[in-house]
C-alpha cells in the first residue's frame, strides 16, 4: 500500500461540509435502495433476527472499511453495499438455501481479494481515457439529476421549495446550499407529520452467525453472478468517480480491503460491499469541501454514520427508509448537480475523444440491461468501442495524464 499523503491541518470550520456530505450520502443509500435487502430477506424466508443480522453486518462492514480507507489514504473513499447484487438476490434467494448463499457470498468475496492482490483491476482502470470516464459518470448520474425535477409532478410543494431554496442559497451563500436544503427538507417533513418518529424504539442489533455451506449450484447461480454484477456495476464506476474528481488511490487496496471485509461479514448475512459509485460522488466533489485535501473527512463521517446505523440494526435503518421517495430523489439530484456539470464538461473538453465520450454518456444514460448486467458496464463497453474505432487505439498513459487537468474549463473544474 502506498504511504498516506500529507494533509493540511484540520480546523473545526473544515468539518461542517464534509460531515453533511457524508450524512447525505448515507441517507440517500438507505432511503434509496436498502429496501432491496428487506425484499431479498423476505424472499429467503429469513427470521427477524437473521434480517437484523444482515443489516448489522453490511452496515458495520461498509462503515469500517470506508472509515479505514479514507483515513489511510486521506481521500473520500465511500463504501456501500452492492445495490445491483441485492436486486439480483431478490430472485436468487428464492431457490438457493440460505446457508449455501452464505457460502457463495464468501467465494465471491475471496475472488475480490485475489483480484485486488493481483493488481489486474488497477491496470484496467488506467486504460480508460479520461473523457470516456467523464461521459460514463455523467450518464450514470443524469437520471438522478432528472429525478430531482420529475419528482415535482408527485410532490410539488416539497420539491418546489427545495429547488427554489437551492437556487437562492447558491446565489447568496453557495457553500451552504446543500446543507440548507437538507435542513429545510427535514423541517418541512416533520412539520407536515410525514416522518413519524413517535414509535421509534432503538434496540441494539445482535449478529447471528450462519455456518456456510458450499455447492456447485450456489457457485454457478449465486457466487459467479454476484462477483460479475458487483465488479461491473459498483467497482468500475466507483473507481471512475474517484478518478474524475482527481483522487489517485490505487484500486488494488480498495478492492482488497472491501473484499476482506465482505469475507469476514458474510457469515453474518452481508452479501457484498464495495466502493460506492453514485453516493460517492456526493462526497468527492466541491460540495463536500472547497479544498480537495479536506474531503476525506466526508469518508470518515459516512463510515461513522454507517456504524451507528449498524449498531441499532433495523430500527435506525427504518428511519431513513421512512423518508418520502421524492425527498430522497430531490436531495440526491441537487447534491449531484455540480458533479454532473463537471463530468459533462470533462466529457466534451478534448476534441479527440468528444464524440466517443458523448456516445458513452448517452449509452450510460440509456441504462441498457443485457445478460443480467447493468447499464454502467454496457455504456463503458460501447464508449470504449467507439473510442477505439474513432481514434485507432487507446492513448498512452502519459497522454491520458496530460489531458486530464488543462482540458476542463476552469470555472467548472472543481464545481462538484
Where are these regions (language model features)?
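Intrinsically disordered, low-complexity non-transmembrane regions of multi-pass membrane transporters
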Residues: 1-21, 193-209, 391-416
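Membrane-embedded helical hairpins/re-entrant loop segments and their flanking transmembrane helices
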Residues: 2-15, 39-68, 224-296
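Hydrophobic, membrane-embedded alpha-helices of multi-pass small-molecule transporters
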Residues: 16-29, 33, 177, 208-237
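Hydrophobic alpha-helical segments within and immediately flanking transmembrane helices
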Residues: 36, 60-62, 82-94, 279-286, ...
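Membrane helical hairpin/interfacial module
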Residues: 49-53, 57, 65-121
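Interfacial segments of multi-pass membrane proteins
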Residues: 88-94, 166-167, 280-298, 386-387
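Membrane-embedded alpha-helical modules
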Residues: 94-200, 301-402
